[in-house]
Amino acid sequence: MIQVFIVDDSAVVRQVLTQILNKDPEIEIIGFASDPIFASEKLSSVWPDVFILDIEMPRMDGISFLKKIMSEKPTPVIICSSLAEKESETAVLAMKLGAVDIIEKPKVGLKNFLEESEILFIDSVRAASNARVKTHSFQNDDSKFLENHKQPKTDFSKIDTTDKLIAIGTSTGGTQALEFILTQLNIHCPGIVIVQHMPEKFTEAFANRLNQVCKIQVKEAKDGDRVQLGSAYIAPGNKHMEIYLSGAQFHIRVLDGPLVNRHRPSVDTLFHSVAKAAGKNAKGIIMTGMGNDGANGLLKMKQSGAHTIAQDEASCVVFGMPKEAILKGAVNTILPLSKIVGEVQYF
């Protein structure tokens, strides 16, 4: 039984989430509170397997409560937040602090959204219950070789086009894993294209924050972007991203379309396009996340001559996507996160 505690100042959210999650016989709501102060009082006698947490609440904000949870008893936390710009940035910070998922909460039509998103919430709770949220101490085996000598940030208008391409797909736990990798790269690394399952607007905030802490350039991808050395492009939320070859240059196509594996952006969509556009000049990496998105596309990349890598179980928050790719025969190499850094830098 997966025990869940809901902390949200909206009575509608607390009521409807309780109703839809209770439909799953494996999920039990053991408590809820309108703010973290009330939650703390109730948590003296019970402790859940998963928290669902709002960000903006009276008396104590969600980030402060998240820090309290992670310091006292690290537990999987799902952020359920609106898409206001300020909250988007805060939600990205929550992921850095250990939250395992973000679910977009609209400001209008909230009750209908919650009822229509029953499968989304149940799947998220199930995935979160399997997540490892203790602080990881990733010992980077390639650190001596990745000294970046405080090199200047990439200038998109001047840098050369990449002739190699790194494609990364990830979901639950991916924000921390991506930050671990990207912050250690220097501006001579190949161009990188990334699908991180994340709602619209959160991807922009995530890319902007990474850009502030990385030596390479990190941005939310735009339709028509030319993929360049020393740069990483994150697929925008609620859009698919594909790569195509124009002359000798890789370009990005951002497009609408139906959900693929219940996701938009989809890792499979990206990987299939990279297989076609780059072939053996690409490297595909599937990392921590729930579900099977990316497994078919990674197999197509492998068949096209690309080298394919899966993050190992020990360093994953959720060993779902890598496991599915391995079982499908799509993976050449299984590596801990600490070894993936060098695979990206030195391709």
UniProtKB/Swiss-Prot annotation:
Post-translational modification (record): Phosphorylated by CheA. Phosphorylation of the N-terminal regulatory domain activates the methylesterase activity.
Location within or outside the cell: Cytoplasm
Top enzyme category: hydrolase
GO biological process, alphabetically ordered: chemotaxis
Modification 4-aspartylphosphate, positions: D54
Catalytic reaction annotation: [protein]-L-glutamate 5-O-methyl ester + H2O = L-glutamyl-[protein] + methanol + H(+); L-glutaminyl-[protein] + H2O = L-glutamyl-[protein] + NH4(+)
Ranges of residues in domain Response regulatory: 3-120
Gene Ontology, cellular component aspect: cytoplasm
Active site (catalytic residues): S171, H197, D293
Enzyme nomenclature, EC number: 3.1.1.61, 3.5.1.44
One Pfam family cited in the UniProt record for this chain: Response_reg
Domain CheB-type methylesterase, first and last residues per copy: 159-347
Domain notes: Contains a C-terminal catalytic domain, and an N-terminal region which modulates catalytic activity.
Job description of the protein: Involved in chemotaxis. Part of a chemotaxis signal transduction system that modulates chemotaxis in response to various stimuli. Catalyzes the demethylation of specific methylglutamate residues introduced into the chemoreceptors (methyl-accepting chemotaxis proteins or MCP) by CheR. Also mediates the irreversible deamidation of specific glutamine residues to glutamic acid.
Family affiliation: Belongs to the CheB family.
Name listed for the protein in its UniProt record: Protein-glutamate methylesterase/protein-glutamine glutaminase 3
Organism: Leptospira interrogans serogroup Icterohaemorrhagiae serovar Lai (strain 56601)
